[in-house]
């Protein structure tokens, strides 16, 4: 009974702490009456409502930008990497590409001061070369401005940066020799 009591207590404690009090902080002040059908992005998202903290007052604009991004990416048949917080892109695009799941400064990659930073950087560049990646695409505001990618762009003068829409940034690395 003691273990059962501990289980019930911890479940209740963490439910209140992380589910009720936190209320998904990013969406706490969002007007959910503005949600849009997520199937406007892709039929695989049917049954879901769409609203994010990035466009809380205009989810339709975000959907339009995501659709435009999806169309651009579908047209790029060359090998690419997509770095985004919109994790569904890997399932809605029919062409193959390599993508990390989620990318955060100091969490997904070691901080500059970390002894493994250089090893990670070399690993990343080696994978670009080995997989013959021609483009890096960033979907989401300021993803391309993370220090790792700023440094990558600054150190490799061959990188051509193109802003394709408000959400989609392209690093063209076809002229780079790694």
Name every feature range the model reports, one short phrase each.
Residues 7-15, 104-107, 120-123, 176:
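Non-transmembrane, interaction-prone segments in cytosolic or luminal domains
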Residues 168-178:
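Core SAM-dependent methyltransferase catalytic element
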Residues 20-21, 32-105, 134-143:
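Short periplasmic/luminal acceptor-recognition loop of GT-C membrane glycosyltransferases, typified by
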